[in-house]
Every structure is written in C-alpha cells, then in structure tokens.
Design a protein with these regions (language model features):
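Short, small-residue-biased leader/transition segments that mark boundaries at the very start
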Residues: 1-7
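Extended, solvent-exposed, polar/acidic, compositionally biased regions
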Residues: 74-75, 127-132, 255-258, 327, ...
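Amphipathic, non-membrane alpha-helical rod segments
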Residues: 8-66, 79-119, 135-192, 205-245, ...
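Functional cation/ligand-contacting sites centered on basic and imidazole/sulfhydryl donors
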Residues: 251, 377
Length: 474
C-alpha cells in the first residue's frame, strides 16, 4: 500500500479545477475509488491482501489521471467565446468584457452563468438597438413631428442617453437592468408621443375656424378644408389656416367694395364722371363680383384678390365727378357773366341755378337756358331800342291816344324786365310774350296813315268851299 494513496494531496484533488470541472461520471469514479481506499485504511481488522490493496490504489491513480476538468473548462471557455462572438447585438466592448468574465471564470458553472448573462444582455441590447435604429423613422413620423416640443425633447433625450450607454468603450454597460431601464425610458417617451392625435385635433379645429370665416365663399372653404385635411404636419395646418384667414380678410374687403357699389353710384364723384371712368369702375366691380359669386374657379391666391381690390380702389379713386361738376359750374358761370343782354339779377339768378345743380347735365341745361334767355333779352332790348325812332315817327305822333298808350304800356313792361333789380324774369316765354306785345303795339301804330287820311279829308272839305279862289284853296 503506497502512502500516497491516502495522503492529504488526494483529499485536495476535489478542490482542484481538474476535479471540479471534470465530467460528473469521472468525478464519481474518482470519489468512489478514494472512498473504497479509505474503507481499507479505516478497517479495524486491516486487510492483508496486497493484491486487493494495490488494485484500490491503482483505481485511485487511474481515476485521478482520468479527471479532465482543466480541459473541460478550457473547452467551455472556448465554446463560450465562440458563442459570445455570435451575439451580434452586443458592442465590441461588451463582447470583450463578457469574454473577459468568461475567461476569468474558475468553473464551468461560472462560464455557463456568464454565457447565459451575455445572451440575456444580447436580447435586451437587441431591443435597445432596434429602438435606437428606429430613431430616424420615428422622428420622421407624424407621431413625432406633430408632437409638442417637450415630448419631442423627452424622446430625443431618451435616445441620446441610450446611445451614450451603448457607445461606452470604457467600462461598457453589462447590467441588464440598466439596459432595460433605458429601453423603458424610450418606450415611455414613445408612448407619450401623440402627434397623430394632435394633428387630427388641429385639423378639426382648423376646419371649424375656416367654416366660420364669413368672407370666403363656400367653394373657397371647401378647397381650404381640403388643403387642411391633406396636410401632413401641424405646421402645414397652421399655414393653411393662416393663409385662409388672410384670404378671408381680402375677400371681406372685396365684398365690402362690391356691396358699396350702389353707394358709389349715388355720389357726385360717380354720376358726374365721364363714361370712360365710370365704365372702368363698373368693370372692376363686375370682375370682383365673379370671385364672390364663384363664376371664377375658387380663387385661393390672396394676391389675385388683392390685385382685384387694388383695381377697384384705383378705379374708385379715379372718379372725380364732383371736381368736374365744380369745374363745369365755374366755366358755366364765366359764360353767364359774359352774356351781355341779361340784366344783373338775371345773371345772378342763372348763376345760382348753376351753383345749385347736382349734375353736370343740370349745369349744361341751365347754361343753355341762360343762353336762350340772353337771346330773348337781346331781341327785347333791340326792340326797346327802337322807342326813340318810334315816338318821333308819324305813326306814333299822329296815332290815337289809345294806340300810343298801348305802345307806351308795352314799352314800359319791356323796360321793366330790362331794368329789373330784383325778382328777375327767367321765363323765356314771358320775355318773348313781352317782345311780341311790344312788337304788336308798335305795328298797331298807324299815325302816318291817319295823317294822310286827315289831309285828304281836309282837302275835300276845302274844295267844297266855293267862296275861296283857287289860290286860297291851294
């Protein structure tokens, strides 16, 4: 029996890696051989059979030499390293750290445990990588784009923190719980991204606002609402709504200008303007009306409406009828002032009629009336101017007192008109009547005829005086 068989060295074999990491059946074989030997050593009646003792000793040596724990541990580490190399969700730093932990393991159990942890880490890293790799898709999604800045920043911060965690080259993160917390932070931030719902709400609010815009036509509202519903972002919705409100203001201005047409038509600036300017204004109004009535395709271009508004305002500002009325009044009054046959009261009265005119046609009418009155007054004045010759004529001197008084009265009435100082006669017919009366009275004077008749009667009577000689008769 060798003293080596039961030495403490054999007892310590079970604490060595070669035993600890050996296959279980080999561990069992060694332990059984060692225990069998101990039974002989501990016998009260010692076994004296040398052959039996040598067999048990040889069994211990054989089973000890058969222990392959070191080799098994080496293979386990190699296999673990190979598996870790296939864990493609881990970073290089994580793989190297995991392999370091495996290689520093003292037992196959530790190796298996570290490998299991590496695999679990790989799983959570896959989730984390997927979330990180989905960043671009997320930030380009409606869910993110249409969210408020705080929620967007929370997501971006969660991703950035995860990227820092992932990209550690020194002391890489191997704690599964820490990785899971980063995953939870990202998922929580994603769940708080409600951009799509907010886009839907923004569209609903915008459509309601557009429908309440009183300046737009129904067709314009329909198109603006379609533009809202076609929008991909809240910013686009806001832009459409802003443009709709701006268009509404322009359309309201256009409506006011078109609706004010009758008011403009009732102003002196319009009805005293020339046809060209009035037609330009009316055409501009008609063009503006087509955008309101929808005869044009629904116009959404604010600049087009603004241009139409500008055309109307320009045409309106080019209406200077009131100024032209005043100009015509001034010209008419100058002409009236030069009508030399009217008396001063007549001129003043005619000027008052001109100044009281509301239209240029009235001014022209009063001027023509003044000219006609002036012609009538000329004829009256010319007839009155004959009075000296008339009164010195035989027709007047030798006519009857009745005819003389008739002429004198007609003459006086004519002179009364010429010499008026108040309440002027503006009725041309009345003047023509006085002229006719004076003419008739003048034509009625037949004094020369009466004188001739008287002479003839006297001669006849003288010729009857037989007592007179011829010389006396002559």
């Amino acid at each position: 029996w060798s003293s080596d068989v039961c030495s403490s060295d054999l007892e310590s074999v079970t604490n060595e890696s070669n035993y600890i990491n050996a296959e279980p059946e080999k561990q069992h074989a060694f332990t059984e051989a060692l225990n069998n030997a101990k039974e002989i050593v501990n016998e009260q009646q010692a076994t004296l059979d040398a052959n039996s003792i040598n067999q048990k000793a040889q069994a211990i040596l054989t089973t000890k030499n058969a222990l392959d724990g070191e080799e098994q541990l080496r293979r386990a580490k190699e296999n673990a390293d190979q598996e870790i190399n296939t864990l493609n969700q881990l970073t290089d730093a994580q793989r190297n750290s995991e392999k370091g932990l495996v290689n520093s393991s003292q037992t196959r159990t530790e190796v298996a445990s570290q490998l299991a942890k590496a695999k679990e880490l790989n799983k959570v890293m896959e989730q984390l990588n997927n979330l990180i790799n989905g960043k671009n898709q997320m930030i380009n999604s409606s869910k993110f784009i249409n969210e408020d800045a705080n929620q967007q920043q929370a997501y971006s911060n969660a991703i950035a923190s995860a990227e820092v965690l992932k990209n550690k080259s020194q002391n890489p993160e191997l704690d599964k719980v820490t990785i899971e917390q980063a995953i939870n932070n990202i998922n929580s931030a994603i769940n708080n991204l409600n951009g799509e719902a907010k886009l839907t709400k923004a569209k609903e609010d915008a459509v309601a606002s557009i429908n309440n815009l009183s300046g737009l036509t129904n067709e314009q509202k329909t198109k603006e609402n379609q533009a809202v519903n076609d929008s991909q972002t809240r910013d686009q919705v806001a832009n459409v709504l802003r443009d709709s409100k701006a268009l509404d203001q322009s359309m309201q201005t256009l409506r006011d200008l078109v609706n004010n047409q009758n008011v403009i038509h009732s102003t002196s600036n319009y009805f005293n303007e020339d046809s060209t300017q009035k037609n330009t204004y009316d055409n501009a109004i008609d063009n503006g009306s087509t955008y309101i009535t929808g005869q044009h395709n629904s116009e959404l271009n604010k600049s087009t409406i603004d241009q139409t508004i500008s055309q109307i305002n320009t045409a309106k500002n080019d209406l200077h009828g009131a100024e032209k009325l005043q100009r015509d009044k001034g010209t008419a009054n100058q002409e009236i002032g030069q009508l030399g046959y009217l008396n001063d009261p007549q001129k003043s009265a005619e000027e008052s009629l001109v100044n009281g005119s509301n239209t240029r046609s009235e001014v022209e009418e009063h001027l023509n009336e003044a000219k006609s009155l002036n012609n009538a007054m000329k004829q009256l004045r010319d007839k009155v101017a004959e009075k000296t010759n008339v009164k010195q004529s035989s027709d007047y001197i030798n006519d009857s007192t009745e005819h003389q008084r008739g002429y004198d009265q007609a003459l006086q009435e004519a002179e009364n008109i010429i010499n008026e100082i108040g309440n002027p006669t503006l009725n041309k017919s009345e003047i023509e009547q006085k002229l006719q009366q004076l003419t008739d009275a003048q034509n009625a004077l037949q004094g020369s005829h009466l004188l001739e008749e008287a002479k003839n009667n006297a001669i006849t009577e003288i010729n009857k005086l037989t007592a007179l000689n011829d010389a006396q008769r002559q």
